[in-house]
Each structure stands twice: as C-alpha cells, then as structure tokens.
Amino acid sequence: MKLEISAKRSQESIRAYALRIIHKNLLKMNLVPGMALSEQEIANELHISRTPVREAFIRLAHENILVILPQRGTYVEKIALEQVAESMFLRTTMESEVMKLACHSFPTRNIDQLEACLELQRISLKQKDYPRFFEQDGIFHGSIFAACGKHRIWQMIEQASLNYNRLRMMNLANDGENEMPMLFKHHKEMLTAIKQRDIEAGRILIKEHVGKVFSNLDDLKLQYPSYFKGGTEDTLI
C-alpha cells in the first residue's frame, strides 16, 4: 500500500489529518474498491499511532465508504451507483439554484478568480494532469458557491459526494483526453453565462456537466466489474 501523503496542516489534529489523507487516497483511487486496509500499515506511512487511523476507519464506515467486518478486516466499499445518482441529483438541484444567483449578481473580483482557475485548468489540460484538473474543477465550482454566500452548502455537497467523485476520477483516468476538454469547455461556458447573466444557459450547462458522470459507465463496468455494487458483483469479498 502506497499512499499519497501531504504534510499535516497547522492546527490540524492527528485524527483529522489521518481522516483527510485516507479520504484523499480513496477519492484519487489509490485505495480501490474492495481493497483490504491495514491500520498498522497506514499508521506507519503517516508516522502516527494506530488510534487516529482506527477512528478514521470508524468515521468512514459510518459514511458507508469503508466496510468493517469483525474478525475479517476493513475494506474499501464498492462504488454504489444508487448513491452516485443521489449525489448527481443533489448537485444538479443545488448548483442550478446557485447558478441562478450567480447570473443575477456576481462580484467582479470573483469573476477574476474564476478566470484564474480556468487558466490553471488550461495548463492541467495541456499537461494531461487529470488529478490537478480534478482539483481545479472542484475549486471552480466551490468558488461560485462561495461568491454567492453558499460556501457551507458546497462543503456539504462535497461530503456527500465521494462515490460520485470516485466515478468522476475514474472517468478522467480512463478517458482524460476526451473528458478534460469537454469539462473545460463547460466551465468556460458557465463563466460566459455568469458574465452575460444568462440564467437559462447556465442551468442547462449545469445539468449537462453534472450528468456527464455516467457517460462512460458501461465501459468502466466492463473494465472494473469488481469496483461497483450491483448484479453478481454485489458481494464485497
């Protein structure tokens, strides 16, 4: 097991640090569905005790991201497509309303922020750096929420969207050369809609953009049948 590890943040507790690193590696598919996890191995990689890792496991199990089986171990939960659909509904509903607010009134300084974010996305696209593009994608959407005074709602959406985001990451990893240009185009058009105060165009774009998560699902299920819940693959082990 090899985790992508970043430094502990100032004022961040050991427990929060362990949770953040594990969550990030689940999202980036370094910890894949069905994988067995070891408290001790992760603790060793993070140079911390097992207790905060165990606490992170319990928290993630409560969120249906990990499965803890007594006497057997802890495993990464498979991607539940029903949960992906629920997250897509949540995002489409909330982002459409926030886009309406953004098209009605949006501060100039925040326009500049979105344009800077698009420039970073353009660089990631050119470098074919899909993890960085994914990160900037989230910053772009989160910045729109923040500019409309809805930052906490975006945080709640992100907390409820791990399965949705894992599938998005798989799409980028599997077909980034097609996915990234299309997503980048959507973002540019969203910014144009905000500038032109075109609510209808903005809401149509949101629906298309968020719903794109299912565009390559059949191919992904063929390549990685053990990663998804449903059908004959419904058993974890």
Predicted regions and their residues:
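Conserved amphipathic alpha-helical segments that form helical-bundle/coiled-coil interaction surfaces
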Residues: S87, T108-M169, H186-A193, A201-V213
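Short linear motifs at protein or domain termini
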Residues: M1-H104, R109-N110, R152, R203, ...
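Short alpha-helical transmembrane interface motifs in multi-pass membrane proteins
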Residues: A80-L81, M170-A173
